[in-house]
Every structure is written in C-alpha cells, then in structure tokens.
C-alpha cells in the first residue's frame, strides 16, 4: 500500500496543503511547529478513521475554522486505488467516503489501508495503563481480521448493556432476570477475543524477537498475555475459555453487584513486556524502552505483510530524537525497500544513506505541493 497524494484543508496547522510522497522512505523535515506531525496524523485519519492519541475531531480543526477536509488517494500492492475523503464540520459531524461512496460504518475502512504509527507519545504502550497495551493489541488485530473487529465492537456493546444492568440492580438481593443471558453472550464474545489475542502473541513473538535482535544485542524480549481469569483459565480453546468465564462469573456475582461493574473479561486483561525476564515497565532504561517500542512497530510491519499480503504505510514521528544514530540507521535499513515510510524530523543530516531517501522540506507556500 502507498499514499499517492493527500489534500489537507483546515486540519491542525494547515489551512491548505497538498502532499505527494514518493515510494520508499520519505523524510519530512522542518522546524518545530511547522506541522510535520499534522501531515502524518491526516494520513492516519484517512487510513484508520481517527487521529493520534484519542484526540477528538473538533480538536483537529484549524484555529478559527468550523470544518476540515482530507482527500487522499492510495494504491494497493496489486494496483487497486482507494480514494478516501474525511469531512468534518461542527454542524454536520464526520463523514467518510470510499471511492465516492459514503460509509455507513467507519469500521468498514479498518484493515483496507494497513497503517502503523510510531511516535514519542506511544511510550504509553510500555509505561501506561493496561488499557494502552490492550489498545495496541486490538489495533493490530483489527487491521488483520474483520471478524476480530466485529467481535470487539460486539463485546463492547454487550459489556455496556451488562454494566447498565449491574448498575440498575444495585438495590436488589439477586441479579436482574436477564443478567444470565448477557453474561453468556459476554463470555462467548470474550472467549473469542482472548483466544485471538493469545494466538496473535504466539505468532508475533518470533517477528518481535528478530526485530529487537537487529536493533540491540544480548537481551531477550518476551510478550506475555495475562488474563483476568488468572489460574481459572485452564483451557486455551474458545469453548474452554468461555466455560471458565461463566464459572468465574458465578463465583464473583456478589462482588459485581456491590461494585456495579463487570470485573472479568478481556477488557480487564493485561499484556506484559519482559527483557531477560525483567518487567520492562518497571526496570527498563529509557533507551531500552524506546528500542522495545520501535521493535514492536517494525515487527508489526513484517507481521501484517505476512498476514495480509499487503505492505503497510509506516508513519514514524520524530524518530531521530527518540533513538541514537546507530539504531536509527538500523531501523531505516530494516524498512528500506519494504513499503512506504514517512518520517518527520527537525533535521536531515547525519544519515549515511540519505541519498536513498526522498526529502520534503516544510518551508513551502500553503496550497502548493510539498
């Protein structure tokens, strides 16, 4: 997959901009505040229907504007073209069209244009709450599997309904009459998600170990899935996981009634990161953490390709400030010749094979091609 062109109107710092990257590695450089990251975010919007760091659509509008418009053209590895338009206004909300047909569900776009982001803010994947690591896992799986995306959305709907029942029955001595129905639905959907997540980590581990070995030496990385079932998870097949969930829900029924929320399921699971057996979140240095994160993303690029048969667009925001030059060059060596990458930086010096990279200077006139 590659981005041929994106036209940006009233998005973040850009009142009007046309950006046409080359195939391979593209370097977007310019001073801080020039809008480099905003270009990557606009591309991310068109590929995955949302911006960075869970920002709202309204926050992405240019100052004093009442709307923004993104028009993009992508071409797949097989030559199929996808025209994606994202239109947002304070009055009309957000609409997304694909090849001139408006999407009823934005989720229909997910996975069509594989896209991977690395940015300094994503350090929360390592240091943040378990929700951040679950989100990393879910974002990857949703780009691979439509079934997973549909089950994840369904699980969230069921969870919301079950929590509403728990909240409304706080003054009852017994569960709401239809609670068991929602519990069974939640267990079935939750078992699917847990199984897919565990299988993903098992398959992804060799890709990640290889990427980390290229970027660093000696340390052995490991990814581990920790279910909220704990020792109650006695089976790794879907039916067994669902049975374990149902049994455990029965055991914690009173606790859930007291706390008025669902205390068990994939929405409470954790992914643990280790280096040589030590918890990365607790013991890794800043350099180790950054290397761990970029290795995750580079490995994901290869993994998505093997799963989908389509190369991903790789967005790397301010990578030069996050890694030393040796690791930066190793990252570039790994992604060179493997799909399209777009990198932002405040400088363009210090790279041994800079001649192999397309340079885009942010010192442009608004409305002119970059």
From Swiss-Prot:
Q: Which UniProt keywords apply?
A: ATP-binding, Cytoplasm, DNA damage, DNA repair, DNA replication, DNA-binding, Nucleotide-binding, SOS response
PROSITE patterns linked:
RECF_1, RECF_2
Q: Where does ATP bind?
A: 30-37
Carries keyword ATP-binding?
Answer: yes
Superkingdom, taxonomy of origin? Bacteria
A single Gene Ontology CC term: cytoplasm
What GO annotations for molecular function exist for this entry?
Answer: ATP binding; single-stranded DNA binding
The answer on whether this UniProt entry bears the keyword Transcription regulation reads no
State where the protein is found.
Cytoplasm
A single GO BP annotation from the record? Answer: double-strand break repair
Q: Which InterPro entries match?
A: DNA-binding_RecF (IPR001238), DNA-binding_RecF_CS (IPR018078), P-loop_NTPase (IPR027417), RecF/RecN/SMC_N (IPR003395), RecF_2 (IPR042174)
- Similarity section: Belongs to the RecF family.
Role: The RecF protein is involved in DNA metabolism; it is required for DNA replication and normal SOS inducibility. RecF binds preferentially to single-stranded, linear DNA. It also seems to bind ATP.
Q: NCBIfam families in the record, alphabetically?
A: recf
Q: What is this protein called?
A: DNA replication and repair protein RecF
Write down the species. Prosthecochloris aestuarii (strain DSM 271 / SK 413)
Gene name of the encoded protein: recF
